[in-house]
């Protein structure tokens, strides 16, 4: 599995303490859409991509008494969809804790992927691109503030297409 980093104890991106997996790829759709470098995570593009063993990551998670969830974030996890699915499949063999996936895609752009992810329990997806000069708002599903008013999280167990 290719990542640019792992944060073993993250207190920021979800209401539960998380292990955060940082994914290495993104098409920088936000920058293209708004015609400027607005990406909050652009500097991550310069990080070194490393290969990680999924079993090792899951073992570190299971043996950490603090983390209660997994967060997958940017760059863009859904641009590494095969790695995302492979990780979730292995993780679900040993644990049913929440998995939160942060994406800058809009819901209509990823319905096919949401249907695939829906087969797994306790998957939450934060949807929506960052829009500059927007007011942040509290998202009840994540239990945190999101940067733009168009962004929201859905629990895929409640998701209907």
Regions found by a protein language model. Name each.
Residues 11-52:
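Canonical Radical SAM [4Fe-4S] cluster-binding loop centered on the CxxxCxxC motif
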Residues 66-94, 131, 136-143:
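Conserved glycine-rich "GG(E/T)P / GGGxP" loop and the immediately following alpha-helix
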Residues 22, 73, 100-104, 128:
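A cross-family glycoside hydrolase active-site/sugar-binding cleft signature
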Residues 60-65:
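Glycine-rich phosphate/diphosphate-binding loops that line cofactor/substrate pockets in enzymes
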Residues 111-112, 123-161:
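Classical nucleotidyltransferase
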Residues 42-59, 78-119:
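Canonical radical SAM enzyme core domain
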Residues 1-11:
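N-terminal amphipathic/basic leader segments beginning at the initiator methionine
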Residues 68, 122-123:
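Conserved acidic residues
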């Amino acid at each position: 599995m290719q990542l640019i980093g792992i944060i073993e104890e993250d207190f920021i991106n979800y209401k539960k303490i998380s292990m955060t997996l940082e994914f290495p790829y993104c098409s920088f759709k936000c920058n293209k859409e708004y015609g400027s470098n607005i990406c909050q995570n652009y500097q991550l593009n310069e990080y070194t991509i490393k290969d990680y063993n999924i079993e090792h990551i899951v073992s570190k998670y299971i043996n950490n008494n603090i983390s209660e969830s997994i967060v997958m974030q940017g760059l863009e996890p859904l641009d590494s969809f095969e790695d995302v699915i492979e990780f979730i499949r292995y993780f679900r063999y040993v644990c049913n804790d929440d998995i939160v996936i942060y994406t800058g895609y809009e819901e209509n752009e990823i319905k096919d992927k949401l249907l695939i992810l829906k087969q797994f329990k306790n998957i939450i997806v934060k949807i929506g691109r960052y829009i500059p000069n927007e007011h942040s708002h509290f998202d009840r599903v994540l239990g945190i503030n999101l940067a733009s008013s168009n962004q929201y999280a859905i629990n895929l167990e409640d998701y209907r297409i």
